[in-house]
């Protein structure tokens, strides 16, 4: 990408704060793709905020997003630096799809949007480690805390969604946190008392049981050191899917938006 855009390379060690600070002053925007962000992300954010440099990442780790917001939001505002989290699969499709759906619902309050996710893909080593960390630290109170959440959630348990012909399983991901912050920033689009919930969409009841069991097993395994280490060793950082695997990857999010007098259905889809 730097070669295509004719950009210079700037190299800096994330474990060297002085080097990071000097490098950040030489650019306007830093795009960091090195996860897990709970291990490697904060020094870059800190250096960017101090230098007044914008910082964009691909994190899907709720605890990291919450930590950065609590500790760097006000310093970033003071230094006119933008911190833009979750600009990958987490959470661009969900955030943009919810925004578009809210626009179609028109003016008014009490809007609710549910999204249903179908996807096929392979984790890279870094993404796998980030996901394990996110499951380990996942806290419902942290993500849905009204202090940081805009509106009231209307999560359902596992249920049949007739409008898409699939079963829905709640997703413990960062997307609702990101969507809720967008809603708080754009009250003109989302209105008051906005809610957003996100689910896996699966075709058969047996797949529902498999998805629920899989999530439960991973959450339990991340709390047991020996099992957690086995998960971490499954794939090393820097090891990603092959081109053939990426060519077969896809995602689709279906959004059901409701207001007091209107219901709309939209979708966002794509490949790797």
Model regions: which residues?
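Conserved Rossmann-fold cofactor-binding substructure of NAD(P)-dependent oxidoreductases
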Residues: 10-29, 33-40
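Structural motif
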Residues: 28-29, 54, 264
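C-terminal catalytic/substrate-binding lobe primarily of soluble NAD(P)-dependent oxidoreductases
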Residues: 80, 103-272
